[in-house]
């Protein structure tokens, strides 16, 4: 199946519908790469600076006034993800997970998140190979981002959490290994960039729209058949 090439700001509902219904895997247009790499560079500069930049070289929330040593940045971002893996309930369908991952790609493609290109590459490879993080259905109200669901998604990328691959549930690191992939190490701000977003809520909204379209189309067909009969 031909992959979708995503151009942030120009992604269509038709493209996202293909992701939902037909399991189309997507990747960013390579034109996005320079902006992504430049934002990654700027974040690294900020992380090494003495000037406090929230979530880059400081703590989060009430700990925003705490300066973080550059050597502790990796642990800070990893702990941010693991501490938010607190979702409950049954896991959401892979069709929704795939939409979430695709929407996160689109967000990163704008070059304003501060993530590095290797993050984008792994997300694209997971979509291509069908590595689907196990994400609990409950745990977000979408207020300051879908923190818990997106943390569960990100956990697999750092070799934690759980993921489905070829119909089997694996530990995150094992799922990546089975697919021939390797986990990433989160750099400054990258954990924050992953969980600050509404891709979980948006994916469900899109799924509702696509299902409604499908139901409407079927109702037209059945009405026509009934009239003809």
Residue ranges of model-derived segments:
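Conserved, well-structured ligand/cofactor-binding cores
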Residues: 1-229
């Amino acid at each position: 199946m031909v992959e979708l090439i995503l151009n942030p700001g120009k992604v269509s509902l038709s493209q996202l519908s293909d992701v939902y219904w037909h399991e189309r895997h997507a990747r960013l247009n390579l034109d996005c790469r320079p902006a992504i790499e430049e934002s990654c560079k700027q974040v690294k500069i900020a992380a090494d600076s003495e000037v406090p930049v929230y979530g880059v070289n400081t703590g989060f929330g009430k700990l925003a006034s705490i300066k973080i040593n550059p050597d502790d940045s990796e642990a800070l971002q990893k702990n941010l993800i693991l501490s938010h893996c607190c979702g409950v309930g049954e896991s959401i369908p892979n069709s929704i997970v795939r939409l979430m991952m695709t929407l996160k790609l689109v967000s990163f493609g704008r070059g304003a998140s501060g993530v590095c290109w290797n993050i984008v590459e792994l997300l694209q490879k997971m979509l291509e190979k069908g590595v689907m993080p196990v994400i609990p259905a409950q745990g977000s109200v979408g207020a300051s981002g879908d923190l818990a669901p997106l943390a569960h998604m990100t956990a697999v990328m750092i070799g934690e959490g759980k993921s489905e691959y070829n119909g089997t549930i694996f530990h995150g690191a094992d799922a990546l290994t089975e697919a021939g992939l390797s986990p990433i190490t989160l750099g400054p701000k990258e954990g924050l960039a992953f969980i600050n977003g509404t891709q979980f809520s948006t994916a469900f909204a899109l799924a509702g729209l696509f299902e409604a379209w499908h139901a409407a189309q079927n109702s037209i067909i059945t009405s026509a058949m009934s009239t003809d009969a």
